[in-house]
Amino acid sequence: MGRKVHPIGFRLGIIKDWSAKWHASDKNFAECLTEDLKLRKAISKKYVDAAISQVDIERQSNKVTVSVRTARPGIVIGRGGQRVDEMRHFLEDLIGKKVQLNIVEISQAELDAFLVARSVAEQIERRVAYRRAMKQAIFRSMQAGAKGIKICASGRLGGVEIARREVMHEGRVPLHTLRADIDYGCTRAHTALGDVGIKVWVYRGDILPEAKEKSESAVTEMAAVMADAPAAVVTETKVADIAAKPKRVVKKAEAEIPAEEKPKRVVKKAENITKEEE
């Protein structure tokens, strides 16, 4: 009871992608996973103030590509790319492999769930009232174009002795809709009285599948139907679409096809139509 599925894991392979893209045998899997954890920990520890949201890792044969998503790329890159080179050499020494470091800028930090959670946590650590911090974060995200947002803070809120949880939300956050683009992030605020957990869900709209472009024109489809094409080529849906089109459009389209490309039935039918018109 009360268990919630992870919003990003629930949508993997549908509208979300994996943050680690590699395959390893059973023998090397533990080693690769340990390297991933080392890389992520080293990057987050070195760039504490760089507003890093996510670290994506891809592996080739003898090369590891690390993509860092950050809202402050200038801090990560440094003057003339100096800090990037230093970080790349450090990561190569850490795992003993060649590392390619890519920096990806986040244009709107207010729509990134982890960065929103991190901003709320930093305000709580500076002794700002948690309700005020949550309301400001919600207002900024909605102003930036979010369709909905929910923030949950749990712990010794306000310094009380008994820990509790408080939730604030605005707009829609459809957790069970797979096409809904929901970003999720969580972090901790370290206070003198203990840790306060912050969870954020940001609904950024729906991701709809792109409309499939029709590879064949109405003329080709009509010719395939009349030539008794296989069922794999002409489906019931295509036949229904062709039948629904006006006869004038079909006749005009048939007339534009060269005679040598038409099936015999189409050629005969076109000749009959021409005779009738005469």
Curated annotation (Swiss-Prot):
It holds the Pfam family KH_2. InterPro entries: KH_dom, KH_dom-like_a/b, KH_dom_type_2, KH_sf_prok-type, Ribosomal_S3_C_sf, Ribosomal_uS3_bac-typ, Ribosomal_uS3_C, Ribosomal_uS3_CS. One of its GO terms (cellular component) is cytosolic small ribosomal subunit. One of its GO terms (molecular function) is structural constituent of ribosome. This is Small ribosomal subunit protein uS3. GO terms for biological process: translation. Part of the 30S ribosomal subunit. Forms a tight complex with proteins S10 and S14. Disulfide bonds: none annotated. The keyword RNA-binding applies. Binds the lower part of the 30S subunit head. Binds mRNA in the 70S ribosome, positioning it for translation. Residues 39-107 form the KH type-2 domain. It comes from the Bacteria. Residues 255-278 are annotated as: Disordered. HAMAP family: Ribosomal_uS3_B (MF_01309_B). SMART domains: KH. Keywords: Ribonucleoprotein, Ribosomal protein, RNA-binding, rRNA-binding. Belongs to the universal ribosomal protein uS3 family. The keyword Ribonucleoprotein applies.
